[in-house]
Structure formats: structure tokens, C-alpha cells
Amino acid sequence: MLYFESLKDKFALNEKQLNKFVFYYEFLKQENQKMNLTSIISLSDVCYKHFYDSLILKEIFNFNTVTNLCDVDSGAGFPSFPLKILFPHLKIVIIESSLKKINFLKQLSSHLELDNICFFHQRVEQYDIAKNGSYDCVVARALARLELILKWCVPLVKKKGYFIAMKGKNFQQELEASKKIIKQIRVKLVSAKTLELPMQLGTRTNLLFQNE
């Protein structure tokens, strides 16, 4: 329980939230034996590379100021499911191209008693254009090059809403390559926060953009 206790201390989780993360890990480990959901499956790696990595977004953005969140290509639920556990008021929309991962997340949401989560089985570039401008905040984690995810994701964001791109340590190169699209779609980089995961498990940079 050491890794879970460190999450509890870092993010001020209550016992109910902590128990949800414990179940999340056990269910992920169980279902991953049946289908390939993630290559990251050890307890320490899941706690820090998945849970911690998702929850740390609260340091770059105040999720209490928004009501809905769109997670693009969520995979096994990161970062939206950890954020939903921490911020239960959020209405979550997940766009995911893998049907098996959607089915996993539907089961998980039922087990964790997480409500107000909608799932769309499709690629983000094929997502219903009528829903453009629908979301207070959109987030994408390890989806594609920054210039591509800006092109795909920012149109989903409301005017004056926010987009969070979760990137690695080489974000500066991607940011430089994205100057043209940033100007074209009229989005502003508000903040860039680089952090080291615990136990030297990697470097992350979270980029916060505002749709102008």
C-alpha cells in the first residue's frame, strides 16, 4: 500500500477515493491478462506513470472551474478516470478508437460508480463536427505530435476554454514545429510545467493552451 499512500498524501485523497484507485489497479491488472490495455502494469509504474501522471494535471489547471472534460484517445482511462475520481463533479466525454478499451472503461466506471461519463468509439479526426466548441477543457496524453493534436483537439474546445497536451521531455522541439498551426487556429500557450515522476520514472511536461 506504500505507493497508494504516497498518492493519498500528495493529492489529499479521502479513503473512498483511495479505495477506488486500489480497485482500479487490481481490475486493470486482471483485465490486462485478457486483452492488451497497457504495457505498464507493475504497481509502482501504474501508481506513478498512470495515476500520478494524470492527477498532477491539477497543478497546471484548476478543474473546479469547469464542468466538462473531453479526453481524446484515453486508452485505459488516463488521465480522465483518475481526474474523475479526484473531481467527481466533472462530466467526462471519452473519444477512443479501440472498442476493447471502451468496453473495459464502461465496466470500470460501473464498478467504481462513476457517473456522467460518455463514450464515443471513433478516431478524433472523425469526431462529429457538430460537437466542435462543446468542451470547457480537452486533454490528450501521448496521442501524436503536438501540431497534429492541436489541429484535432482545439476545435473541440469552447471559446476561452482550455486544451492540455501531456508531453515528454522533448516538448520544446514539438512546440517549435507547431508555431504555424498555433497561429492559424488562434490558440495561446498559457503555461508549460515540467516535472519529474517519483522514483526517477521519467520526465513529463504538461502544456496548457487557451482557445482564443
Curated annotation (Swiss-Prot):
A Pfam match: GidB
Top-level lineage group: Bacteria
Keywords linked to the UniProt accession: Cytoplasm, Methyltransferase, rRNA processing, S-adenosyl-L-methionine, Transferase
EC number annotated for this UniProt entry: 2.1.1.-
Positions bound to S-adenosyl-L-methionine: F78, E96, S97, S98, V124, E125, R141
First-tier enzyme category under EC: transferase
Cell compartments where the protein resides: Cytoplasm
Gene Ontology CC entries for this record: cytosol
GO molecular function: rRNA (guanine-N7-)-methyltransferase activity
InterPro entries reported in the protein's UniProt record: rRNA_ssu_MeTfrase_G (IPR003682), SAM-dependent_MTases_sf (IPR029063)
Function per UniProt: Specifically methylates the N7 position of a guanine in 16S rRNA.
Similarity comment: Belongs to the methyltransferase superfamily. RNA methyltransferase RsmG family.
Entry protein name: Ribosomal RNA small subunit methyltransferase G
Organism in which the protein naturally occurs: Onion yellows phytoplasma (strain OY-M)
